[in-house]
């Protein structure tokens, strides 16, 4: 469970995060939506202890990320390509992630089989450094890196960016299948309302760092209210 209480962050006069209370329950697939500048990425960086809040707190399974490293073993995240070690090939990078997580190379190779369709023959076995991959294939490497350890909490910022239509559709299945198989909590931001509604069990709408809506999304029930909000 993730608990956010009175979390605040400003950059100068700009309010980037002002969340009084938000609880993300175990097993939620939470879609985070909002226009540019809504504070989605700022919230993710606060969750991952990449930014220090001006006030308030974040607890991941009752651990404050600013005070302990223990939460890192249970969280997988990909925000942008700055997370990647781009002078490695994808295989070298995944092997490194496996090693620091206590996985054997056999276990890493077995996990990678789950992503063969998503990789579409463009990531594995190409003998290319990550830095030389296309934006879409870097995105695939980042997403796989967040999932390969099978963490119980996954945070992905705009995962559908840079992906072609086929890869976007496959990714939706990858994420929903992962959630079903592991019971993990997924937190995903996206500008694509359709993809968000398709895969999320709950949708949170942010504007100027504030939670405007927190909608259950059974059978895409949040779609109409979200469309009405963004069309106003």
Please place each PLM-identified region on the residue numbering.
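The feature captures the beta-strand-to-loop junction immediately N-terminal to the Walker
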Residues: 33-35
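Helix-to-loop junction immediately C-terminal to a conserved catalytic motif
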Residues: 48
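Conserved ABC transporter NBD signature motif
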Residues: 56-71
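Conserved ABC ATPase signature
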Residues: 129-133
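Catalytic Walker B motif of ABC-type/P-loop ATPase nucleotide-binding domains
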Residues: 154-158
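H-loop/switch region of ABC-family ATPase nucleotide-binding domains
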Residues: 189-191
């Amino acid at each position: 469970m993730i608990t956010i209480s009175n979390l605040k962050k400003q950059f100068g006069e700009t309010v980037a995060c002002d969340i009084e209370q938000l609880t993300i329950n175990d097993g939620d697939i939470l879609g985070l939506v909002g226009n540019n500048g809504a504070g989605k990425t700022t919230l993710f960086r606060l969750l991952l202890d990449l930014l220090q809040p001006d006030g308030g707190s974040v607890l991941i399974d009752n651990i404050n990320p600013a005070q302990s490293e223990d939460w890192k073993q249970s969280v997988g995240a990909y925000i942008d390509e700055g997370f990647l070690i781009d002078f490695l090939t994808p295989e070298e990078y995944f092997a490194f992630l496996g090693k620091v997580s206590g996985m054997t190379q056999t276990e890493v190779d077995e996990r990678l089989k789950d992503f063969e369709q998503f990789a579409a023959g463009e990531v594995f076995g190409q003998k290319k450094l990550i830095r030389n991959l296309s934006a879409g294939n870097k995105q695939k490497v980042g997403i796989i890196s967040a999932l390969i350890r099978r963490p119980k909490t996954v945070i992905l910022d705009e995962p559908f960016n840079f992906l072609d239509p086929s890869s976007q559709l496959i990714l939706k299945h990858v994420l929903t299948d992962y959630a079903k198989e592991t019971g993990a909590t997924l937190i995903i931001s996206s500008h694509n309302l359709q993809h968000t509604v398709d895969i999320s069990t709950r949708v949170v709408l942010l504007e100027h760092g504030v939670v405007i809506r927190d909608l259950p999304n059974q059978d895409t029930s949040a779609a109409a209210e979200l469309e009405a909000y963004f069309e106003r």
